[in-house]
Design a protein with these regions (language model features):
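Positively charged, solvent-exposed patches that mediate nucleic-acid binding
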Residues: 1-152
């Protein structure tokens, strides 16, 4: 099946794939929330790397149909915002869904695009993000805490 022309792609290089990538983004603890979405951000390893996206849609949100609908809507919104250069480069983002209500129709798609763009701009513009980014790149950033040994 051929791709539609003019459609922005979503290659592997635009996705967070490994659990380590997700852990690094969550460990920095920089987030912004709006409506049903929470966006976590972390500077990428390379400042010239395009923005990458990871999705977290819990089974608490609904059944597989609802979760996959959210994922499709978020991936497409990210593709559109990224194609317009609406996201700051050199950052990794994780979107967490908090609500099961998926915005419907074309108006809903535009609403999700605006939310993603707004959240990304807000979290990157917050005071201390640049300092945390520099510390994280030097390895002095927040490290995941080791779990104490479990007692039996």
């Amino acid at each position: 099946m051929a791709r539609a022309t003019g459609r922005a792609g979503f290659p592997r290089t635009a996705r967070l794939l490994s659990p380590g990538d997700f852990a690094r983004v969550f460990a920095l603890r920089r987030s912004a929330a709006s409506g049903p979405l929470v966006l976590y951000a972390c500077p990428a390893v390379s400042a010239v790397q395009p923005a990458r996206l990871g999705l977290s849609v819990s089974s608490r949100i609904g059944n597989a149909v609802v979760r996959n609908r959210w994922k499709r809507r978020l991936r497409e919104a990210f593709r559109q915002v990224r194609a317009r250069a609406g996201l700051p480069q050199g950052n990794d983002f994780v979107l967490v869904v908090r609500s099961a209500a998926v915005p419907a129709g074309a108006a809903g798609a535009r609403q999700v695009e605006e939310m993603i763009c707004d959240l990304a701009t807000r979290v990157v513009a917050r005071p201390g993000y640049a300092a945390a980014a520099a510390a994280a790149k030097q390895g002095a950033g927040p490290q995941p805490t080791a779990q104490p040994p479990r007692r039996r």
